[in-house]
Amino acid sequence: MKDSMRLFTTMARGEDGLYSVEITRGYCDGKCVFCRRCYENRDILKPVNSYEADFYEEHFVNHQARVAGLCAKVAEYIALEQKKATVLIQAALLHDIGKIFIPSAVFMKKGRLTPEEFEVVKCHAVLGAFYLKGRGFPASVTEAVKHHHERYDGAGYPDGLKGDHIPLLARIIAVCDAADAMLVGRHYRAAISRKMVIDELLRNSGSQFDPDVVNVMVEIINEEAVVNV
């Protein structure tokens, strides 16, 4: 699998002073059907002001691209079938697309969310899957998007799926999503060290995350640490 990103994301200012942020990045060489589908859906836009444009670029678009990169490494590590690996990367590139339907004031909030706000944010998984289905994406992609916040112990959302009942691709995205959030940080939480990320993943292995995927991610993080010394 090629380890290159093709940027389909732009921020174009309109006459109304708002920016339209394309929310997808293309991965690999752009020749696969999923990348073409991604490219054809460049009109998935989020109108925002200049400050929000920078925020969405970093915490939404760039995050999805990084998660896709981690998913590609997991797929390679476990020798995932090429077709499934392609689906995994496409789903990862779009896993948070439902957040375009979440009010910016909630999505961008720096403090702790209220219970009501958290319920709103939780809707992004279902909204994203529904939206992608309506735009012609296959069930393999939409199901991974819908279930990437399920927990291995069954305490996640939206359907409370447990263990192997959670689609494998969703289980992989869940770990990669969390790893990136900790390694890079969020707007409301600073990044932490690789050791702390590993400790946190292992602490939640078997409860929040698939233990097998966690073990692979730990190996990847350790290898990255060696490479970047």
Annotate the PLM regions.
Residues 28, 32-38:
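Cysteine-cluster motifs in flexible loop/terminal segments that predominantly coordinate metals
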Residues 8, 20, 44-229:
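Histidine- and acidic-residue-rich, metal-dependent catalytic cores
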